Structures are given as C-alpha cells and as structure tokens.
Amino acid sequence: MTDTQDKNYIIALDQGTTSSRAIIFDRDANVVGTSQREFAQHYPQAGWVEHDPMEIFATQSATMVEALAQAGISHAQVAALGITNQRETTVVWDKETGRPVYNAIVWQCRRSTEICAQLKRDGHEGYIRETTGLVTDPYFSGTKLKWILDNVDGARERAERGELLFGTIDTWLIWKFTGGKVHVTDYTNASRTLMFNIHSLQWDDKLLQILGIPRQMLPEVRPSSEVYGHTKSGIAIAGIAGDQQSALFGQMCVEPGQAKNTYGTGCFLLMNTGDQAVKSSHGLLTTIACGPRGEVAYALEGAVFNGGSTVQWLRDELKIVNDALDTEYFASKVKDSNGVYLVPAFTGLGAPYWDPYARGALFGLTRGVKVDHIIRAALESIAYQTRDVLDAMQQDCGQRLSELRVDGGAVANNFLMQFQADILGTCVERPQMRETTALGAAYLAGLACGFWSGLDELRDKAIIEREFSPQLDETQKEKLYAGWKKAVERTRDWEDHEA
C-alpha cells in the first residue's frame, strides 16, 4: 500500500499489437486523458511477424507523457500505473546494455511451426497440455524463445552465461521503466509462455529442459496486483495483466461462470472458472485469470477466427457495404436471413471444431435472397460462432452462463448484440465504459496501492449502458442454431490434404 490521499489518478498503459496507448482514469474510473501511437510491423518472411522492442518502449513512453499533458496533470498526482499487453510476444535483451538481441517475435508469428512439430513427434504434446493448459502451437512464447536462442548468433551461449533476459512485453516495459532494476511478470502472462506450470505456479523445469531454456533468463512471477517497483519519475508500477485477462477483470468477471467476449477482428471469449483449472475436452485453452483481489483464478479461453474480419470482407472484397457501421441498418431492413447462412471459415475453423481444412461458404441461396440477407447472415455468423464456444465452455466446466459481458468495436452494433442475446438465450450486457482492457489494468494497480478500497467499490462503477434480453422463443432459437450446425458440417474438411 502507498499513500494515495493526494494522488487522484491512475495510468493504464495498453500495449497492443499495432499501437501503444495510455489512458488516465480518475477515482470515479472516468477517462481524463488518452494518447495513442502506432508503430511499425515487420514481415521479414511469409508468416513471420516482428516488432522493434525499442520502438514499443519509445511509443509507450511518449503516450504516457502525452496523456498526462492532455489531462493537465503531473507525475506527482498519479497514484500508480498498471500495464496490460499483447500476450505471448517475446523479447530477449542484454542485461547490461538493455539492447534487444533480436526484434520482438509477435504472437501472430508462425516461424516456430517446425519446432512445435518436433515437440509433437517427440511425444511432449500431452505433458505440455497437462502442465500449461495450452496446445503445442507457435502462438505461445516458449518456441519463439527457443528459435531466438537457436538462430541468433551467440545467443544460447550468452543466455547460459546469464547475460541475456527474456520477457513478454509487460516484463520488457517494466524493466525499461525501472532502469533495469525489476525483472518481473505476472501469472496471466506467464501462463501464455508454454513454460509455466499453471497448477504449481512455477516455471516448469521439465519444459525448460525440453525447450533448452536457461532458467536464469526468466523473470520472477508475481500476482497481478501488487507494487513491483517504481518508474524513474517515482510512479508505483502496481498492476499487470495480459490483454484478455485484463478485459475480463475490467468487466468485473471475477466469479465462476462469468464470461466476456471481446469482438474484434476475431473474438476472444474467456469464462472465469474460479479456483478450478478446468481441462477442456473441446480444445479450449485453460489459462490463468485474476480473482477478486487480483490473485490467481482460472479461466477457459476460446477464440473465433473471423468476427469483424467477416464484415471487412463484405466491405473490401464483396463491396456490398461502404462502412462496417452500415451493416446494422441493412440487417435490420429484413425480418430474418431468409434461410441464408454464411460460414466464414476463411482460414479454417477454430474452437470447438479445430478444422484447418474447412473453408467459407454461403448456404440457402434462392432467387429471393437479397444483399440485405447476406449482410444479416454475416453478422449472425459472429453470434453463432460465439455460441459454439460458449456451449463448449459450459459443457467443460458444468457452469451455466449467467450473462455475457461484451466489449470491442462490434458491440456498437445493436442488431448483433440483440441477435447474440437471442441465440444464446442469455442476457448480453454492454458497459458504458468501452475501455475495459485498460480499465482492468487500472483496477489492478488501484487495488494494490489502496486507491480503491475493494471489489464492492469497483462494482459500483461498472455501469451497464444497455442490456439486451433474449426475445426468441426456445423452438425458434434452436431451429436457427440447428441450421447453423448443418451449414458448418458442410464446410468441414473441404480443402484437399494428405490424411
């Protein structure tokens, strides 16, 4: 706890995949200052994605200065700083100079596909799943780190001599902000590395041995809400969470069975499972979330590959809408989709199908089908895919969803939100505060330093702007969903491949 009596603001740093942002909140959790800076994406080969860690730090530092200036406040008025970040992205740097030995390898980067294939051939897949809650995939940090050690000249030897440090983006930023004094991460970010035992809450020696990672490179793992250190200007760094877990906390989904969906290019669904690390039989990830006081809780996570990107396809490739915002108007012009289903399996199907060979398709076309029906079917596909994942979550954990809390760009679409409630048969709650990811980091930092007293105070600030209640009867709902399931089956295993 720190004395926050005269300090009336919390800064949240939201370090994302394409931009760095800073958002300043007051005691009522209102936004009083913001700044955002984009940075370069590097694509050295097909399927490879990199960022410059120094540019990430520079843009993130600049946004903090700019947000403070916009709000007209000084560092001395800030009680604490919370960090939320793109997860899995991997940085390795020299402990003495603070210079990265290679660009940050981004979560989207697929360069370690062959490393993952070798892990599977060597029979490690089951142990990885059991220990980390994750699947053996290039998405996660461990194989990215192995690639750097194997491919950057001298990196492995330097790491073994204790000269190099590893971190996800939160760790890198904190190390830089504290002038190299603090090398730390939180449980949520550690749980995405493929090196962390989510049951013992320790780095896993067997996994480090399998991947060939020297343990001394790794940061200390701490709870998501505590004071880790101070910036050079004296601000307490007091909260860390990966972006999706931060949004879950920002939505106050801290009890078992509470869930949120972030509607972006794809959709990220997380359901809090409390102190139970639920093993999924539907290919969902088991991950660490934040409990009521920022302590360890568990969650199930599932991703929908194509959400907002389906609407972008209507706009950019089919050119049947000029603006994503127009889809609500066109979808509402017709009473239903006229039997049309769009399955947007452009890059295969994610949870719970896991079919990389599925391909997108339109079903139910007749001469009576208009553009409006196709636009409506595209929006409905986002809601159907969300139900696919939530049904799997409910089956895995035996918890009935109480309500779905939503955030992300597409939640402004009232048609989509209403249809989501209809097809789930569950209330959908849209918060007044849309900055839920940054808010989660601010809450974690504010709780750690006594800026806010506890969960009850935070719940009072969680104003629901609109609640969408289900309006379809059970028979109608299940008939529509059965049509979706039938359409999905027809898209399965479409692309030719070797068995």
Swiss-Prot record:
GO process annotations (BP): glycerol catabolic process; glycerol metabolic process; glycerol-3-phosphate metabolic process
Record PROSITE patterns: FGGY_KINASES_1, FGGY_KINASES_2
Binding positions for glycerol per the UniProt entry: R87, E88, Y139, D243, Q244
TM ranges: none
Pathway listed: Polyol metabolism; glycerol degradation via glycerol kinase pathway; sn-glycerol 3-phosphate from glycerol: step 1/1
EC number: 2.7.1.30
Class of enzymatic activity (EC top level): transferase
Matches recorded under Gene3D superfamilies: 3.30.420.40
Entry binding sites for ATP: T17, T18, S19, T265, G308, Q312, G409
GO MF annotation, one: ATP binding
Catalytic activity: glycerol + ATP = sn-glycerol 3-phosphate + ADP + H(+)
Family: Belongs to the FGGY kinase family.
The protein's name in its UniProt record: Glycerol kinase
Species the sequence originates in: Pseudomonas putida (strain ATCC 700007 / DSM 6899 / JCM 31910 / BCRC 17059 / LMG 24140 / F1)
Taxonomy of the source species: Bacteria, Pseudomonadati, Pseudomonadota, Gammaproteobacteria, Pseudomonadales
